[in-house]
Amino acid sequence: MTKDIATPIRTKEILAKHGFTFKKSLGQNFLIDPNVLRNIVDVASLTPQSGAIEIGPGIGALTEQLARQAKRVVAFEIDQRLIPVLRETLAPYENVTVINEDVLKADVKQVIATTFEEGQDLMVVANLPYYVTTPILMKLLEAKLPVRGIVVMIQAEVADRIAAKPGTKEYGSLSIAAQYYATAELAVKVPKTVFVPQPNVDSAVLRLTIREKPPVTVADEEWLFAIVRASFANRRKTILNNLIHNLVGKERKDKAVQALAEAGIDPSRRGETLTIEEFANLSEQLQKR
């Protein structure tokens, strides 16, 4: 077996050989601890028949661990400068395909259809750049890809927010949006010291297991999420005040009061105390008016 890419010495050698410099604008932080990478792969529960989709492979540290476990790996890399590096570091692995494209602009569903077998066990596994964590995760979830789940290394604070429960200070619109599509579980906390360059914050590995169907049924998903966003626009305001100022307007205050009453929600409550079921009920009541 080839020597792991993710050691401080080998990472330094690869970067020096290719004259690579980190781009802050791309949020590039490379993992230099093989044990952490193996933990990520373990959380994904891949089998020799699984397929893996990676985002932001960097120099291939996580990619090689995935390639050793999965039948096939597809990795999206936005940075053209890393393509020749990956061609070299991943040369021993014939089951890896690297696509030089921004995953936010890519047709991931089409890539899956042309790369993997129909019905194959698929997982998204990635060490995501902090600055695009939420857009990437929401794109993947909203696309309703044929994957079992998503395992990502992200900023610990964001992972806490995604996995948060009602009534906690971390709970917000991101928690509800993610948990509408998947169950969320914090798997491993990761210190900032295992990255180069070292970021300012710690990370966490988050496991999202895709739901067969959402926990609630609503006529209009966009309307549900609009209500959720409005309800958290000002965390110190009541649900009624947030709805009036951020969604329905003062002229429709009576309708908001009626909808809350019909949904059995005290108008003096704050958004952070509402469950997704209560938000779904509220969205249906507001839509009637």
From Swiss-Prot:
Keywords: Cytoplasm, Methyltransferase, RNA-binding, rRNA processing, S-adenosyl-L-methionine, Transferase. Its main location: cytoplasm. It comes from the Bacteria. Its EC number is 2.1.1.182. S-adenosyl-L-methionine binds at residues 29, 31, 56, 77, 102, 127. GO terms for molecular function: 16S rRNA (adenine(1518)-N(6)/adenine(1519)-N(6))-dimethyltransferase activity; RNA binding. HAMAP family: 16SrRNA_methyltr_A. PANTHER family: DIMETHYLADENOSINE TRANSFERASE, DIMETHYLADENOSINE TRANSFERASE-RELATED. Belongs to the class I-like SAM-binding methyltransferase superfamily. rRNA adenine N(6)-methyltransferase family. RsmA subfamily. This is Ribosomal RNA small subunit methyltransferase A. It comes from Halalkalibacterium halodurans (strain ATCC BAA-125 / DSM 18197 / FERM 7344 / JCM 9153 / C-125) (Bacillus halodurans).
